[in-house]
Amino acid sequence: MTSYSLFWMSLLKNNWKPISNDFVICLWTLAVTFIRIYWIFFVPLEWKKDLDNEKWSFLRKTENVVCYNHKRDTINRLRKLKIQKIIELPPPYPNGWYGILKSSQLKAGEATCVSCLGEDLVIFRSKKDIVFILDAYCPHLGANLGIGGSVADDCVICPFHQWKFRGTDGLCINIPYSTSVPKGSKLKKWISQEVDGFIFIWYHAEQTELPWDLPVPMGEIDDTFVYHGHNEFYINCHIQEIPENGADIAHFNAIHKKNFINGSWAQKKRLFGLGSHHWKARWSPFTGKLKYLAEVNLSHTFKLFGKFGCFRMEVSGKQIGPSIVCLEVNSYTFGKIKVFQYITPIEPMLQKVVHEFYGPRWIAPLMKIFIYGESLMFERDIKIWNHKVFNRNPILAKEDASIKKFRLWFSQFYSSNSKIYSEATNIGW
């Protein structure tokens, strides 16, 4: 053994000490603190609830019904009760743009299946990053191209027999085991657009109507804004009832006055009397070439102990067609925030609603609170929607004038060939 090795062994023997418990605790504390800081500032908050997450059990205490063993039975029973008033329902699928898939959920060279608007669709992205949407079922033997289908150039290939369909027009251009393509081998091609990180589809009952263009970008997001998270809900109601909330001025202070700490069901009495939310709202439609737009303006103040006004917010929003809302929130507390709402009818009485939140990076801790509070507030509306019926001719107070204006404005999204409820749910042979 060399003198050099003996020197280092002697040094380690005389100076080595076991790591103290205090040092280990310090390391763990630093690690946990770092992870928490990283989560607060860099991890988006995701909040998702479907009909199974609804607390339906309280209904059995107030309704004379047979108790089912499974929550799904109760949900289906209530949905059938609501459908009894189908004569009141407007067509379930209004004409317009619908956000049906996040851009991040579809990579180049991938195909996926989406069911919405009473249709099954295959959505695929070419290697050149172009998105195409076609009817999902192969005209050959009915395979779903969105489940197992592959992408080549701007085409999607059926997983069953490798029939190849072109995304630009839906035509079948190749059958690997045949020298010709049968006449009529074509899938319907849907008009689509990719904006603000979402893939949108144009739906129109007349099929000949040219769509209005979506504003690009809809919310004017710049480089200072980052994605902070989203929530996603499934709701048992007609699509029209959700955006109608913006024109229902009286509901804001009826449903959303109580402190969000009270939770998602504001009727419950809690011990939290710290303060309440106070709202002022205004809704108005656009006219002329922009008649497919409407505007909502909200003023919010949180009154601490019912006296001291704080957490003031000014909210301005645009309703784009039947399903899209872009909100801009200005607040001394939260700064400037962008919120996008996308509604997609899955079935005539089942809506998927997504809210996406954007803001500066530095307000990330406050955004977690904002998203949490907004989600709870929205769940209060969902409690109402899940258990109400649609009244075609409601009795309105004079203060409800904006609801009448909204319904007149929204009626433009129905046309002569819009499917009524019985047509949208008809299954024939």
Swiss-Prot record:
Keywords: 2Fe-2S, Cholesterol metabolism, Iron, Iron-sulfur, Lipid metabolism, Membrane, Metal-binding, Oxidoreductase, Steroid metabolism, Sterol metabolism, Transmembrane, Transmembrane helix. Residues 98-201 form the Rieske domain. Pathway: Steroid hormone biosynthesis; dafachronic acid biosynthesis. It is an enzyme of class 1 (oxidoreductase). Its cofactor is [2Fe-2S] cluster. It comes from the Eukaryota. It is found in: Membrane. Binds 1 [2Fe-2S] cluster per subunit. GO terms for biological process: cholesterol metabolic process; ecdysteroid biosynthetic process; instar larval development; metamorphosis; multicellular organism growth. [2Fe-2S] cluster binds at C138, H140, C158, H161. Disruption phenotype: RNAi animals show apparent growth arrest in body size compared with control animal, also loss of nvd-Dm function prevents larval growth prior to the initiation of the molting process. Catalyzes the production of 7-dehydrocholesterol (7-DHC or cholesta-5,7-dien-3beta-ol) by inserting a double bond (desaturating) at the C7-C8 single bond of cholesterol. Essential regulator of steroid biosynthesis, as this reaction is the first step in the synthesis of the steroid hormone Delta(7)-dafachronic acid. Required for insect molting, metamorphosis and body growth throughout development via the regulation of ecdysteroid biosynthesis in the prothoracic gland. This is Cholesterol 7-desaturase nvd. It comes from Drosophila melanogaster (Fruit fly).
